[in-house]
Swiss-Prot record:
Family the UniProt entry places it in: Belongs to the POMC family.
GO molecular function, one term: hormone activity
Originating organism: Struthio camelus
Name of the protein this chain belongs to: Pro-opiomelanocortin
InterPro entries associated with the record: Mcrtin_ACTH_cent (IPR013531), PMOC (IPR001941), POMC-derived_peptides (IPR050878)
Gene from which the chain derives: POMC
Amino acid sequence: SYSMEHFRWGKPVGRKRRPVKVYPNGVQEETSEGFPLEF
């Protein structure tokens, strides 16, 4: 999963090591990280 995150965003996701689109509930947390979400 880590390599997938690194591949998609070009940087390690950190505390979250799974695709963001799987759980829309965590989207706000991902947004605070500063990742370009596909939502």
